[in-house]
């Protein structure tokens, strides 16, 4: 590979002073190596360096989009059946490529360089779009805390009676009324238990009976 670049650089240096020697260097290297070792911007027939003075460049564009082709594309998008002639015409439109024509003025021969077809470009574009969608991170959906608590309560209460559902206060909310009621009940039960233990066996109060105390809990 380094020898190829060296010979090409030497040929470009000799093209002004000795064009025949430059062509001979390019021909000698191409004849002793593989077919794919041709030089860029060089005529493959006479090994003349193609510059603006000794070459002519033309561009043959792809087949244009006609109304008939547009109708066939619309039918194909709707998954309609196409005849053999219509399918062949549509395939010819998709496989059409732009052609770069370079004519060497020394040997009067034309070299064709084909571009990429429409089907290849469409596939490349679709693959790039899918790769971009896979690479983009998916942001999780944010839900409000009230809606989340509501969803949890509804899911937990399915198949249960309303009496079995337990409501827990959310964080940040206090229940002073419930706490005061629980404290008064505890004091009352403690006083009843103290009176029940301190009374003698002779004078028993029916209101301070042990069964009555347990039933009041």
Curated annotation (Swiss-Prot):
It comes from the Eukaryota. InterPro entries: DUF4674. The modification Phosphothreonine is found at residues 130, 139. It holds the Pfam family DUF4674. The keyword Phosphoprotein applies. Keywords: Phosphoprotein. Belongs to the UPF0711 family. This is UPF0711 protein C18orf21 homolog. It comes from Mus musculus (Mouse).
